[in-house]
Amino acid sequence: MQLGIRLHDVNAALPAQDQTLEARAAKAREEGFSCVHLALSKCIKGVSFDEAALTEGLAAYVHRVFGRQELDVAVLGCYLNLAHPDPGQVKEFQSRYFGSLRVAALAGIGMVGTETGAPNAAYKFDGNTHSREALRTFMWNLEPVLEMAEKFGVMMAIEPVRNHIVCNVERTLQVIEGMKSPNLRIIFDPVNLLGTDNVDRRDTVLGEAMDRLCDHIAMVHLKDYVRTENGLMSVAAGNGEMDYTAILRFLKARKPFIQATLENTTNDNAVRSRELIERLYASV
C-alpha cells in the first residue's frame, strides 16, 4: 500500500504563502507521504478551473511540481454535480470533466475522481437522491465523460457516498454494469459508506463492499468518524471509532500496491495518522 494525503488538508490553517501548490507538495513529502489526492480548485486559490483554464501548460506545471517532490498524484478530483437539474449547467460541468481528463492525461495522472451528487442545484441530500430516476440521470450524464476518459486513456473513478446518488454496493454495481466502460473505476472510502442508519452494522456493510466491489476498487480514502447529534462527523484516522483491521487486511491481500490517501488531517496529526495506519498495516 502506498500512503498519501488529501493535499488541500495540508497547510490548511497556515497563511496564504504556505498554501501554494509548491508549499503543500513540499510539506506532504516532508510528512512522509508518497502520493496525493489533488483537487485543483481547493489547492490553488483565486483561479476558476473552468475548461478554458485546464490547459496543457497547467498539466506541465502540475507534473513539474509533484515530480520535484517525487510525489505521485493518485487522483485528480473534480467534484461537480452530474445530476444537476439545469441541462446548461450539466453541459458546463461535463466540459470541466473533459478538461480535467485532458490535464490528467498530460500530467501523468492515471485517474480523475468524482462523487455522484444529488438531483438538485444545492448538491444536498433530498427525498429523491436515492431514487431510480436520479440514478438514471447521473448515468446518462456520466456517459460522455466516460467516452472522453476512454479517448484520453485515463480512468474515471466514482466514489459511493451514503447521502449521494450512488450510496451503496447495489447502486454502484448498477452503474458499473450499466455503463460497461473499461475506464470506470471505484474509489473506496469506507467511512463515506456509513451513516446513522447503518453504522451499527459497519463490519457487514464494509465487508460486502470489499467483497463485491473488489475488482473495481482503484484507490482508497482513509479517515475516521465520531458520532454527533447531527450524524457522523469525519475526523483524521485514529481519532474516532473506526476499526481498520479488516480493511487493511483486504488491501494487503488483494490490493498490495494500491494508493490510499488520508483525509481530514491537519498538520498537527497527519504524521501520527500515517504512522498509525502503517503500524496496523504491518500487523495484519
Specify the residue positions occupied by each region the protein language model found.
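A structural motif
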Residues: 33, 104, 109, 217, ...
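H/E-rich (His + Asp/Glu) clusters that bind or coordinate divalent metals
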Residues: 237-247, 252-254, 258-261
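C-terminal helical cap(s) of enzyme catalytic domains, especially alpha/beta-barrels
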Residues: 270-284
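Active-site acidic/histidine proton-transfer and metal-coordination neighborhood
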Residues: 22, 26, 61, 65-69, ...
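A short, acidic, flexible beta-alpha connecting loop/helix-capping segment that sits on the rim
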Residues: 10-11, 261-272
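Glycine-rich, proline-tolerant flexible connector loops at the mouths of alpha/beta enzymes
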Residues: 37-62, 116-122
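Acidic/histidine-rich catalytic cores of soluble enzymes
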Residues: 2-10, 18, 36, 76, ...
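Catalytic domains of carbohydrate-active enzymes, especially glycoside hydrolases
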Residues: 21-42, 108
